[in-house]
Amino acid sequence: LGLVSVGITGGIGLLQLDQQWIAVKEAAIPGLIGLAVLGSTWTRYPLIKTLLYNPNTLDVGRIQRKLDETSNSALFEARLLNATYMLSGAFFFSSLMNYILAVWIVTSPTGSAAFNEELGRLTLLSYPVIAIPSALMMMGIFYYIWRTIHSMTGLAFEDLLASR
């Protein structure tokens, strides 16, 4: 995706398209990922369940036995679904912030030296404005999942991890 994004940015500059296309491009990639994550909730394999709650990462058998013992399986599934919604929301936040930042910063005609400088400034500011908050949201989602598993099973963190 990164290579495609760089190619699109270069294409916008070379074709001297309106600078608003930079904002659209900046918002499109995390927006599409957010839609894919959200869309995964209507499949048998929501993204959080596929990526995190799987036998390669966690001791799913042990966790499921504890959830069954405490009759928390349905509530746990609902919380995993909530975590998937939260992850989708984090990508939508990133998409919105990318768009706002690009509209605010990139104002010069495409293909100009000022346009290239603004792209550099956009990249620089995207870290504190978008990347760090998004990373904090992701860590919050992982904490939410861990806290959910711990509170519903009583298992310690070390007991949750899959053994190799």
Predicted regions and their residues:
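Long, highly hydrophobic alpha-helical transmembrane signal-anchor segments
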Residues: 1-39, 111-117
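Lipid-exposed faces of alpha-helical membrane segments in multi-pass integral membrane proteins
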Residues: 4-11, 28-35, 89-100, 129-133, ...
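Structural signature of transmembrane alpha-helix termini at the membrane-water interface
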Residues: 11-18, 35-42, 96-107, 136, ...
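Membrane-water interface of alpha-helical transmembrane segments
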Residues: 19-26, 74-81, 85, 117, ...
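Membrane-proximal helix-loop-helix units in multi-pass membrane proteins
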Residues: 21-77
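Alpha-helical transmembrane segments of helical membrane proteins, especially in multi-pass transport
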Residues: 48, 73-106, 138
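Short, highly charged, low-complexity non-transmembrane loops/tails of multi-pass membrane proteins
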Residues: 52-60, 153-164
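Alpha-helical transmembrane segments and their immediate juxtamembrane interface regions
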Residues: 104-158
